[in-house]
C-alpha cells in the first residue's frame, strides 16, 4: 500500500456525523487494519469512534481487515457497526463477501452475511472522507481557472507563481493536469507542462481522467507520463485496461515501457490475471502475445488460470492451458 500525497499531510478530513479528524489519523487506522493490529484500531476508536468507518477514496478500515483475512478485527469492526452492507470496493464494485470468497475466507464471509441480515447492528452508511486543503484565494482561483479552461488567467497566474503547476495536491490529489487531460485540452496541458506540471505516479482515478480519451493519453505518454502509474493499492493503469478489455490503451502503455507483469494488492493479480478474471478473452490473447507470464500472481488463488476456472471462463482457460509455461 502506497501512502498518497494527501495522506502524508496532516490535513483536516471530514468523517461521518460531521466529525473532523485528520488525514494522518485516517492513514494510521487504514494501515493498522491492513496489518490486523486490533489494539491500534481500538486506540483510534477510543480517540474518535468515527475513525472506524473513516474512508480514503471510498475505502474504510474493514476493507483491509477482510481482504487480509483478519477475522478478529473484522468481528470487532462489525460489532462496532462500522460497515455499510451496501459497500462496494472502488473501482471494481464488488462486495466484501466476494473479496472474502475469492480468498477462501469462508468464516469472514459468514460474518459479513450475518451482519448484513441484521440492520440493527449497522451504525454507519454511505461515503465520507472529504479533505480540506487549506488553499489561499489565489490558489483556488488558479484551480478554478484550469477547470474552466481560463487559459489567459492560468497563464497570468503561472507567470507570477510558477510553483503552482508543480503542486500535485490540486484536484483532490490527482494533479493540476486532471481536467485538461479528461477533456483532451492539449493547449492547456502544454501550458501547464511548460511550467513543470507532471502526472503524479500514484493516482486514484487515472483511468477515468488521464486515460479516458486515447488521444489525451497518447499525448501525455509522449510528454513523459509514467507508464507504470498506479493506485495506492498497486493497481496499475495496465491492470485497469486489462480488466476493461481496452486493448488499444494497453498497447499504448506497453509501447512506452509499462511493466507487463506487476502484481496488485487488491486482487494479487497481474494484468493478465485481471483480464482472465473478468472474461476479457481478446485481452488475454493480446497480453500473452506480448510475453505476459501465464503463471505469475501474488497468491495461489489468483493465478490467471485460477481466475478463469473460478469465474467460469472456459475459453480463457483453454487459451491459458495452451500457452502454459
Model-derived features: positions:
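Intrinsically disordered, low-complexity regulatory segments in ankyrin-centric signaling systems
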Residues: 2-47, 67, 79, 110-161, ...
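Ankyrin-repeat boundary/"N-cap" motif
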Residues: 23-29, 54-61, 87-95, 135-142, ...
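Conserved ankyrin/ankyrin-like repeat signature
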Residues: 40, 72-73, 107-108, 153, ...
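Ankyrin repeat domain, specifically the short helix-to-loop turn at the C-terminus of the second helix
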Residues: 43-50, 76-83, 113-117, 158-164, ...
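Ankyrin-repeat and related helical/solenoid repeat scaffolds used for protein-protein interactions
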Residues: 63-91, 261-310
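Leucine-rich solenoid repeat scaffolds
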Residues: 92-116, 294-325
Amino acid at each position: 500500500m502506497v501512502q498518497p500525497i494527501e495522506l502524508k499531510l496532516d490535513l483536516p478530513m471530514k468523517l461521518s456525523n460531521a466529525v473532523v479528524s485528520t488525514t494522518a489519523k485516517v492513514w494510521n487506522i487504514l494501515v493498522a487494519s491492513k496489518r490486523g493490529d486490533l489494539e491500534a484500531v481500538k486506540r483510534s476508536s477510543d480517540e474518535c469512534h468515527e475513525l472506524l468507518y473513516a474512508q480514503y477514496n471510498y475505502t474504510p478500515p474493514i476493507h483491509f481487515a477482510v481482504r487480509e483475512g483478519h477475522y478478529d478485527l473484522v468481528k470487532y469492526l462489525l460489532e462496532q457497526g462500522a460497515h455499510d452492507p451496501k459497500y462496494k470496493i472502488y473501482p471494481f464494485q464488488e462486495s466484501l463477501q466476494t473479496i472474502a470468497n475469492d480468498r477462501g475466507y469462508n468464516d469472514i464471509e459468514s460474518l459479513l452475511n450475518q451482519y448484513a441480515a441484521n440492520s440493527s447492528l449497522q451504525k454507519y452508511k454511505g461515503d465520507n472522507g472529504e479533505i480540506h486543503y487549506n488553499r489561499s484565494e489565489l490558489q483556488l482561483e488558479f484551480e478554478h481557472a484550469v477547470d474552466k479552461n481560463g487559459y489567459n488567467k492560468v497563464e497570468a497566474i503561472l507567470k507570477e507563481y510558477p510553483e503552482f503547476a508543480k503542486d500535485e495536491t490540486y484536484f483532490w490529489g490527482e494533479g493540476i493536469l486532471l481536467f485538461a487531460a479528461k477533456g483532451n485540452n492539449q493547449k492547456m496541458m502544454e501550458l501547464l507542462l511548460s511550467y513543470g506540471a507532471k502526472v503524479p505516479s500514484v493516482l486514484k482515478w487515472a483511468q477515468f481522467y488521464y486515460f479516458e480519451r486515447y488521444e489525451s493519453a497518447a499525448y501525455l505518454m509522449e510528454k513523459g507520463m509514467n507508464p507504470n502509474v498506479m493506485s495506492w493499492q498497486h493497481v496499475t493503469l495496465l491492470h485497469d485496461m486489462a480488466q476493461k478489455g481496452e486493448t488499444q490503451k494497453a498497447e499504448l502503455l506497453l509501447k512506452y515501457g509499462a511493466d507487463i507483469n506487476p502484481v496488485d494488492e487488491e486482487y494479487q493479480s497481474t494484468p493478465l490475471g485481471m483480464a482472465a478474471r473478468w472474461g476479457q478473452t481478446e485481452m488475454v490473447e493480446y497480453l500473452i502475445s506480448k510475453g505476459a507470464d501465464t503463471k505469475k500472481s501474488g497468491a495461489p488463488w489468483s493465478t490467471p488460470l485460477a481466475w478463469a476456472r473460478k469465474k467460469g471462463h472456459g475459453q480463457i482457460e483453454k487459451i491459458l492451458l495452451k500457452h502454459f509455461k
